[in-house]
Amino acid sequence: MYLESKRAPAVRACGLTRRFGRAVALDGLDFSVAAGQVVGLLGRNGAGKSTLLRIVSGQLRQTGGEAELMGAPVGMETLGRLCLIGDTPDFGGLRNAGEFLAVCRCLFPSWQEEQAGRLMTLFGLPLKKPLKGYSRGMQTALLLCAGLASGAELTIFDEPSLGLDAVMRERFYDEVVAAHRREPERTFLISTHLIDEVARTLDYAVMIDGGRLLAQGSPEEMTRLYLCVSGSAEEVGAATAGLAVLREEEVAGTLVRYTRLNAPEDAERIRACGRVQTAPVSLQRLFVLLTEGKEAERDAG
């Protein structure tokens, strides 16, 4: 659970821009993430997530704007407080997991040896088996174990579910929640396009699309002003009069309308009508609705 503090933001971007020739990967991105949370960086493949992570980890320089970690510009001082687990396993010629963990022990000042051992057992990873004999899922799990046990003030996982089966993915998310409960001062940032899968884990979410900020806030804050309303066209129209419509479709003769509320109280008013059915809008569905809206705006422009 997120505990408010006066610490500097874990990650802050101000007008952050990155161009590759004529291609714009980040387009004036602005957001701020408070420290001590489990944060989701959510977006489609190609949205700019990996470019952003390369900038905040010092692997890539921005074209314009500012990027800060823990209140300071990205640099050697901030990178010493960061652990970035990328989406492509690369063990640099190390022979086995034991050698890899020995390197991690030297890299991270707050390395948690006991946790590392427990996680290796939990994910069924043998220390002495050659890494070339590890499956892709095992290699990914080894990296995730290192991130969890790093003790780093800011720990970032880029597409952590790649190669993992459903059981191992759920196990990983459970371990992130447990680690944050033990160490509430740490910030965990999970970059992914699998929004429904990670939603239950998050205290805060940053949605980006086309290199721009789409929305940010806690999952509850972001979804509470959206509602799915279904029924006859006449009843749905009456119940949602005066509200913005993001999308509507007809399913088996029933009109399904996704709407943006003017205030949370609108949901109770609609439910009180008794003539329509309502359902909350998931974080995944909200992302789809917002990206569709942005695409419609671009097409209209």
Ranges and model annotations:
Residues 2-4, 244-247, 251-301:
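C-terminal coupling/interaction segments
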Residues 11, 26-28:
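Conserved structural motif at the start of ABC-family nucleotide-binding domains
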Residues 39-44:
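The feature captures the beta-strand-to-loop junction immediately N-terminal to the Walker
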Residues 57:
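Helix-to-loop junction immediately C-terminal to a conserved catalytic motif
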Residues 64-78:
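Conserved ABC transporter NBD signature motif
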Residues 86-143:
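ABC-family P-loop ATPase nucleotide-binding domains
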Residues 155-159, 164:
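Catalytic Walker B motif of ABC-type/P-loop ATPase nucleotide-binding domains
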Residues 173, 177-261:
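ABC transporter nucleotide-binding domain
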